[in-house]
Regions:
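C-terminal catalytic/motor cores of large multi-domain enzyme assemblies
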Residues: 1-220
Length: 220
């Protein structure tokens, strides 16, 4: 195996061996978020336009502020909740393998600043030019496979983190509200979390907070 593949194999085997995962998922109406993105991008130049991934990252960070026990590390038999929200952003490498460098202080940055940071981070990750802090500081990882057509993804927690959030493709789906059925753009959000650190009701609160923040993208 290539060195990166060996490192991934060791980390994932350790995760499944040591971490009792629990899994939750929910469907989230993205109509408000996509409408806000469209309006926002009309005011921006082509190089400054925002992608849905940025809104999903920012909403995840805000939800972690609401439910902080998913934001941290399991070390020496106890949960250490992090003071900052540094989200690992999973990036597939062109030669194979995966990295999830940290985007720092996601909850305090604007969507525009986050988009600029991703434009810088992704090519550096693929060129092998990441800083050590970007490789070690993540407090939770986000994986998004929507651009590959996947509808949902359940990730494997990267130790010592205690959760990973996954997003699938945004799809038009039937949606019932107030007795009426229509079609909405919907994303499936999933959570894999460490049962030593939290229980299912904490995970459910997080997914509910995530959905609420995505209904009010102008506040992100």
């Amino acid at each position: 195996l290539a060195p990166m593949r060996r490192a991934i194999a060791a980390a994932m085997a350790r995760s499944k061996r040591e971490i009792p995962h629990y899994y939750l998922q929910t469907r989230i109406d993205m109509r408000a978020a996509l409408a806000w993105l469209q309006a926002e991008n009309q005011r921006r130049s082509l190089t400054e336009r925002l992608l849905p991934a940025v809104v999903l990252l920012k909403a995840t960070a805000r939800a972690l502020r609401d439910v902080p026990s998913l934001n941290g590390h399991w070390i020496d038999g106890s949960l250490h909740v992090a003071e900052q929200v540094h989200l690992g952003f999973a990036i597939a490498l062109k030669g194979g393998g995966l990295l999830a460098p940290a985007v720092h202080d996601v909850d305090t940055k604007s969507c525009g600043a986050l988009m600029a940071e991703l434009h810088d981070l992704i090519p550096r990750a693929r060129a092998g030019r990441l800083r050590s802090s970007e490789m070690t500081d993540a407090t939770l990882t986000v994986t998004n496979l929507g651009d590959l057509g996947v509808e949902s993804v359940f990730g494997v927690i990267y130790p010592p983190q205690v959760a990973i959030v996954g997003f699938g493709r945004i799809l038009d789906q039937p949606w019932a509200e107030q007795g009426m059925v229509g079609v909405r753009p919907v994303v499936t959000a999933s959570l894999a979390a460490d049962h030593r650190a939290t229980d299912g009701h904490i995970g459910a609160r997080f997914l509910d907070a995530l959905s609420r923040h995505l209904q009010h993208p102008e506040q992100l």
